[in-house]
Amino acid sequence: MKFIQNNREATALLAIVCLFVFPGALDSQYLSVQTLTMVFSSAQILMLLAIGATMVMLTRNIDVSVGSTTGMCAVLLGVMLNAGYSLPVACLATLILGIVAGFFNGVLVAWLKIPAIVATLGTLGLYRGIMLLWTGGKWIEGLPAGLKQLSAPVFLGISAIGWFTLVLALLMAWLLAKTAFGRNFYATGDNLQGARQLGVRTEMVRIMAFSLNGGMAALAGIVFASQIGFIPNQTGTGLEMKAIAACVLGGISLLGGSGTVIGAILGAYFLTQIDSVLVLLRIPAWWNDFIAGLVLLGVLVFDGRLRCALQRNLRRQKYARFISPPTPLQAEAKTHAQQNKNKEVA
C-alpha cells in the first residue's frame, strides 16, 4: 500500500496499460499505435486543463470555472478570426484573456479571502454569460483552415498541438519538481502558515496558480476550436469536473501539497481512454459520465482508505519507541493468565 501511495504515477500508468490490453482481447485491432495516438489526440484538451488544475489543487484550492473560461476563450478566438485578425494575434489575445480570467479568480481567493469554491462558482456563471453575450447564443462557424491545420498530424501521428502539449507537460513537471518556483506551490498547499514563516509569498503563489490555470484553459479553448472546426454555445460545459477528476486519478491530493503534473496527465489520458473503450464495447454515449464518475468514486474511496492506513502506520512507528517490549517473565505470566481464563470459560 505504501508503494501505491508513493508511486501514483506508476499506478495510473498500470491502469492505462490494463485498459489498453483487456479490450484488445475482444478486438485485436484495438491493440495498435493508432489507438494510442487517437486517444492522445482526444485527451489533449483535458490534459491542458489537468495541468492547470494541478497548479491550483497543489495550493489547496479548486477552480470550477475552468470550463466556462475555456468556452469564453474559444469564443474570443472564433470572433477575432471571423473578424479578419490573423491566427497568431487571435491566439495571443485568447491566451491573455485566459490569464486575466484566472488572475481575477486568484484575486478573489488570495486577496479578498473568498473561498475558492464560492469564488469560482460565481465566475463560472460570469464567464459563461460573457460567452453567450458575445455570440448571442449562436454557434461560431466558418473558422479558417489555418486553425484546423494545427491539429493535423505532423510526426508519428501526433499534431503540432499534441507535441506542444507534451513539451508543456514536461516543462511544468520540471518546474514543479526542480525549482524553487515549483516548491512554493507544494509548500503553500502543505502548510500555509509554515510557508509564510519561510518567506513564501503565499498570496502571490495562489494568484499565480489561478493565472496559470486560466492560461491553460485558454490553450484548451484553442485546441478545441482547432479540432472541432466550429464553436458551439455550450463549449467547455462539464470540463471542470473532468479536469479535477483527472488530477485525483493521477494522485493530486484534494488537501493540497502532493502530486505531480505527470500523474495528472496520465489521469486525463485514462479518463479519455474510458470513452474509447465504451465505444468499442458499443455502450451508449450517455453512460460515459456515469462510468467515469463511478471510477472516480472508487479511486476516492480507495485513496481515503489508503491514507488512513498509512496514517495509522505512521502513528504506530512514531510511538513505538515509547512502548517497551514485554520481558520474558511478563510474557510468560500473560500466557498463563490467558490459559487460566480459557479453563474457567470451559
From Swiss-Prot:
Residue stretches spanning the membrane: 13-33, 38-58, 71-91, 92-112, 114-134, 154-174, 212-232, 248-268, 283-303
MF-aspect GO terms: transmembrane transporter activity
Keyword Signal carried by entry: no
InterPro entries: ABC_transp_permease
Keywords: Cell inner membrane, Cell membrane, Membrane, Transmembrane, Transmembrane helix, Transport
Keyword Transmembrane: yes
Membrane topology annotation: Multi-pass membrane protein
Any single Gene Ontology cellular-component annotation: plasma membrane
Superkingdom in the source lineage: Bacteria
Compartments, record wording: Cell inner membrane
The protein's role, per its UniProt record: Part of the ABC transporter complex LsrABCD involved in autoinducer 2 (AI-2) import. Probably responsible for the translocation of the substrate across the membrane.
Protein family membership: Belongs to the binding-protein-dependent transport system permease family. AraH/RbsC subfamily.
Subunit record text: The complex is composed of two ATP-binding proteins (LsrA), two transmembrane proteins (LsrC and LsrD) and a solute-binding protein (LsrB).
Protein name stated in the entry: Autoinducer 2 import system permease protein LsrC
Source organism per UniProt: Salmonella paratyphi B (strain ATCC BAA-1250 / SPB7)
Biological classification of the source: Bacteria, Pseudomonadati, Pseudomonadota, Gammaproteobacteria, Enterobacterales
